[in-house]
Design a protein with these regions (language model features):
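Active-site and NAD+-binding cores of ADP-ribose-processing enzymes
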Residues: 2-62, 85-208
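Extended catalytic/binding region for NAD+/ADP-ribose chemistry, centered on the ART fold
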Residues: 59-89
Length: 208
């Protein structure tokens, strides 16, 4: 499947070389202290920051020259992204082991707004968020865009809320992010709601 016409490197270069107001429309700055959320498989020594160089997912780089890390802007979306293929969630097997990492921007992070960029690429935003058959295209896009920004913002296919894909040439992000906390989901709460309540009441999961 080919979502792009022409040489993508040249197309993106022309977009970024165009009028400054175009750049302002597609590039956002995430301020220092912005908080992100990520569910991870275990505690990992209290570390939530890890850029995966071996990932083979939507916005990983084909060259593996940089690792990718996915973050959500709400814990609800972080939970849904992690458990997207689950029908039932087990408290003992899942919630006691899996953890919510809260991570903070340690510096200003420049991200590309995929919703603003897609029309300039003459590509439907929905196609970029399609099934795994589009990964060759989205990974190529990530490869090109990683030369212009720290990451990109896209909308979760599951909640419609913003998610962030970040790239770094260091597994620890080289000072881009700061760990705030890593908490087992059995102990995690946000705005007075436990992770279990969010999963059941807001995300409609069956939690046993």
């Amino acid at each position: 499947m080919n979502l792009f016409t022409g040489d993508l490197h040249n197309v993106v270069a022309q977009i970024f070389a165009s009028a400054e107001n175009t750049y302002c429309q597609i590039v956002k700055e995430m301020a220092v202290d912005t908080v992100f959320y990520k569910v991870q498989d275990q505690y990992h020594g209290g570390n939530g920051t890890y850029f995966n160089f071996n990932a083979e997912n939507r916005f990983s780089l084909i060259s593996k020259s940089k690792g990718v890390m996915y973050l959500a802007t709400t814990p609800h979306t972080g939970l849904k992204e992690y458990y997207q293929e689950y029908e039932f969630i087990d408290t003992e097997d899942d919630l006691e082991l899996n953890c919510m990492a809260e991570i903070q921007a340690a510096r200003t992070i420049k991200i590309i707004d995929l919703a603003a960029l897609a029309p300039l690429l003459k590509t439907a935003l929905g196609d970029l968020m399609g099934p795994k058959t589009v990964y060759a295209d989205t990974q190529l896009l990530a490869e090109v865009l990683s030369n212009y920004a720290d990451g990109m913002e896209y909308l979760s296919r599951h909640t419609g809320k913003p998610c962030i894909a970040l790239w770094s040439d260091a597994a620890d992000g080289n000072g881009m992010l700061k760990n705030l906390s890593v908490t087992p989901l059995t102990e995690y709460s946000h705005n007075g709601m436990s992770a279990k309540q969010i999963l059941k009441s807001h995300l409609n999961y069956k939690v046993t």
